[in-house]
A protein has these predicted regions:
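Short cysteine clusters
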Residues: 45, 64-67
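Iron-sulfur (Fe-S) cluster-binding segments and ferredoxin-like electron-carrier domains
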Residues: 51-58, 70-80
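Short cysteine/histidine-rich metal-coordination sites, predominantly Zn2+-binding motifs
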Residues: 59-65, 79-87
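N-terminal pre-ligand scaffold of iron-sulfur
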Residues: 1-59, 89-121
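Short, basic/low-complexity N-terminal boundary segments at the transition from targeting/disordered tails
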Residues: 1-9, 66-77
Length: 121
């Protein structure tokens, strides 16, 4: 299977706080604005499956709100800890809109965040 591009939001409407969490094609996606542009990553810490969108984006990284694990928004690489890297998603601006490319298959258990009260994938 491949990937499919999905419209997310008009670039002009992107939140001023620099981040937006969305469910796209079954994937939990975090789009963040850094000094280098917009980037999209799986909205799930690889350490304990927390939603990274509840954390802060600073200096090109997103920090997990649970234990402070940091991930590079552009590459998904975990910085300063021995946790697995994040999945990244291709992002493009088309006719003023932000589009994200996600796999056609939904995420497995190991890539879905833990959300209290939500059913498992």
């Amino acid at each position: 299977m491949g990937n499919t591009w999905h419209f997310l939001i008009a670039e002009a409407d992107f939140p001023e706080n620099g981040k937006l969490a969305a469910r796209i094609g079954g994937w939990h996606v975090l789009v963040g604005r850094t000094e280098d542009g917009l980037f999209a990553v799986n909205d799930r810490c690889t350490h304990q499956a927390a939603l990274l969108s509840a954390g802060k984006i600073r200096r090109g990284t997103v920090m997990c709100p649970l234990h402070g694990a940091r991930f590079d928004m552009e590459t998904g690489r975990c910085i300063g800890a021995a946790y697995a890297d994040l999945r990244t998603f291709a992002l493009r601006i088309e006719q003023g809109g932000i589009e994200i490319s996600v796999p056609d298959t939904p995420p497995g258990f190991d890539e879905a965040p833990v959300i209290p009260g939500a059913p498992l994938p």
